[in-house]
């Protein structure tokens, strides 16, 4: 299915009158920052262990900012692979008594409910995933949606905003920690590889780049 199909779908859903500034900024798409921590690199076989999502909002001057963060530790799905090296890298302890993990279905149902609420508040029709190396996060999100046979996924199935690419353009850095440093965003390496922390820092980075572009005159509030 082509990008043009989704563009036509969004245009067809638009009503009369002026659009919400956020909907006008991203052509009806709402940026939602997502980060996942996993049991490996294969979205079809490896466990989803943590997921966080931060919705993005816009102030009255047209500048964007991180709004609300949803975070869940997730139980590996039945038969999921978990690589020991992945646990060592992330520091996740599956048997920790305070981990309090939930099922994939519980996590995604709650996140999707919050995203749909944000879509309505911003006059948008579909969410677009923002991630640092976003294809990885979108791949695991889509794999979980397919496993659960979820019919109401608010995210675009293949388009995304990649902050590794955007940060490379804006700051000459593609590593999240270094990109944040270049953007004067505090980054604690001891907190890295937590889905919540990485999502919130990625959201700050994304908003900073979008706002910087606006300040430089790269985007004006118009509706074509």
Swiss-Prot record:
Catalytic residue positions: 193 (proton donor/acceptor)
GO molecular function: 3'-5' exonuclease activity; magnesium ion binding; nucleic acid binding; RNA exonuclease activity, producing 5'-phosphomonoesters
Pfam families: RNase_T
Principal EC category: hydrolase
EC numbers for this chain: 3.1.13.-
Record's subunit section: Homodimer.
Function: Trims short 3' overhangs of a variety of RNA species, leaving a one or two nucleotide 3' overhang. Responsible for the end-turnover of tRNA: specifically removes the terminal AMP residue from uncharged tRNA (tRNA-C-C-A). Also appears to be involved in tRNA biosynthesis.
Protein name (Swiss-Prot/TrEMBL): Ribonuclease T
């Amino acid at each position: 299915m082509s990008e043009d199909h989704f563009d036509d779908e969004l245009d067809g859903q638009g009503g009369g009158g002026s659009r919400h500034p956020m909907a006008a900024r991203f052509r009806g798409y709402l940026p939602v920052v997502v980060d996942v921590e996993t049991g490996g690199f294969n979205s079809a076989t490896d466990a989803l262990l943590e997921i966080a999502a931060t919705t993005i909002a816009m102030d009255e001057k047209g500048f964007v900012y991180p709004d609300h963060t949803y975070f869940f530790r997730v139980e590996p799905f039945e038969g999921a692979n978990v690589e020991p090296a992945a646990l060592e890298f992330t520091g996740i302890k599956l048997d920790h008594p305070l981990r309090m993990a939930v099922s994939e279905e519980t996590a995604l149902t709650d996140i999707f409910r919050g995203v749909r609420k944000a879509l309505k508040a911003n006059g948008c029709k579909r969410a677009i995933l923002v991630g640092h190396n976003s294809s990885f996060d979108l791949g695991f999100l889509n794999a979980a949606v397919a496993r659960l046979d979820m019919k109401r996924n608010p995210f675009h199935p293949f388009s995304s905003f990649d902050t590794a690419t955007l940060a490379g353009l804006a700051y000459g850095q593609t590593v999240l920690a270094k990109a944040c440093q270049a953007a004067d965003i505090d980054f604690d390496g001891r907190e890295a590889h937590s889905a919540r922390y990485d999502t919130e820092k990625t959201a700050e980075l994304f908003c900073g780049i979008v706002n910087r572009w606006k300040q430089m005159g790269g985007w004006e509030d118009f509706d074509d």
